[in-house]
Amino acid sequence: MKIATYNIWNDESTLELRAKQIVEEIRAVDADIIGLQEVSAEFYNKHLATEASYVHHAFMQYPGEEEGLAVLSRYPLIFLEALYQRENYANSTAMNAFFMVDGIRFSLTNVHLPWDSVGAREHQILAVDRHLHEQKADFHILMGDFNGDIGSSVDRYLCGEQTLHGCEANPPWNDLARAYAARCGEAVKPTLDTVHNPRWAGKKSIYVPEVMDRIYLMDHWNEIALESVNLFGTEITKKTGYVASDHYGVVAEVNFRK
C-alpha cells in the first residue's frame, strides 16, 4: 500500500498558477490513500474532486475558515470524523477516516498542527493520540504537517521518548521516514526546505530546513514491512518557477499483514 501526505500551500497569490502542478504531483505519486493539508473548499471542488483521479475523497473545512483537510483514497471511506468539531479532543485540526482492505481495518488520521503555538501543538497531539488509542483498528496511520521538526516535543512524545503533561503514547508510534533512512544509512531529508524551495529564493532566510511532514504507524503486533519512503513535489517547473508547494510531499510503501 502506498500512503502519502502533502501540504499543498494555500497561498492565494500563487495557488492557481501552481494548480496544475499540484494535481500532476498527486496523480504521479499514485498513492492508494493521501492526506492533504491547506486545502481550500474552492480548490477541492475545482481541482481535487474532479482532476486527481480518485473515486473516494472527502474534505472537511475548519469552522469559520476557508480551508481545511482532505483525503483522497482508492478505497471506500467507511467513517469520517472531524476532530476540530470536538471540544473533548481539544478541537484538534485533524480528520480521521476508516477504510478496509482485504478484511484489514485501517484508521488514518490527517493532521495540520498549529504553526504559531507549541503549547497548542502539544495539547492537540495529546488529544489526537488519546482518541486513536480509544479506537479499534488493525493498523493506525498518523500523517500530516506537524509544524515541528524531528526531535520536537510532539515528535518525541509520539515516539515514546517523553511524556507531555503527565501522559505518554503507549503504544508509541514509528516515523517511517526515519526508519527507512536509518536502514539506508542516510539522513532524513527536509520537507520544508527553506534553502532550495523557490518560495524563499533571494530572501536570505533565517529559517532552517525542517522535517515537518511525517507519516507515523502505531506499534502493533501485526506484521508491517516498510518497502520505501520518498519525497515528491521537489522539482521546479520552468513555466511557473515554483515547485508545486512550499512543502514537499512524503510517500511510503508499506505491506500490512494481519
Where are these regions (language model features)?
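Glycine-rich, highly charged phosphate/nucleotide-binding loops
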Residues: 13-25
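Structured beta-strand-rich core segments of catalytic domains in phosphoester-bond hydrolases
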Residues: 15, 27, 33-113, 228-230
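Residues at alpha-helix caps and immediate loop-helix transition turns in enzyme cores, especially N-
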Residues: 18, 46-47, 68, 120-124, ...
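Glycine-rich, phosphate-binding/catalytic loops in enzymes
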Residues: 20-22, 50-53, 88-89, 125-127, ...
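Metal-dependent phosphoester-hydrolase catalytic domains
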Residues: 133-140, 148-258
